Amino acid sequence: KNYAVNVKDVSKMVEGSYEGNEKYVFLTFDDGPSPLTEQVLDILKNENVKGTFFMLGSRLDSGQAPKESLKRAIEEGNAIANHSYSHNFKKLYPGNITDVNYFMDEFRKTNDIMRDVLGVEFDTNVLRMPGGYNSRVYYKDRNLEELDNNLESNKIVSIDWNALNGDAEGKPYTLNEMIDYVKRTSRGKNQVVLLMHDTFGKEKTVKILPEIIKYYKEEGYEFKTISDANV
């Protein structure tokens, strides 16, 4: 069974310009791998659904366990994408303006680490910018055009999200509030790209994940992954 949807189509889904009315949900996890990634993978396997992991190069570099999580995620049919190396806003966006050369270096560095783990044939051009691409638009980042040109010439597609569980919103939510947040932000959308985090301290995300999956199953969504535009 093919779970993958081309990132260019997913990009349209997030922007609301996609023409189709298929009910798709993309479970996306940022900032891993961490010890919680294994628990997330257990749940996905148990529920027989797939997800997309936007991984940090610095986390992959931090030891053998994160590399094993990366391998396992791929072996079990999930998708892997690039979330920068450092996630360090001061380096990526000094003065809240993208340092394009530095940003691109981090993207390449992270892909290289993934390749070291998964083999030379691995490549991804799927990116999620730390903070999201739309935050750059919101802050009127004056280097956005230069960044866009760089992404385009490297065939890299940046993907944000259109639903979230609130696990990175600054204020702590109860489990029920997080589940409600997912339902509220997903309502009325045929294609949902759900933002979650599988990094340290996100135990609540793991706890509610089976419930979230159940919700989308009951609502008739198919679970999909975000695939490379070059595939």
Map each language-model feature to its residues.
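Catalytic domains of cell-wall/extracellular-matrix polysaccharide-remodeling enzymes
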Residues: 61, 65, 87-195, 199-217, ...
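Active-site beta->alpha N-cap acidic-glycine motif
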Residues: 1-128, 231
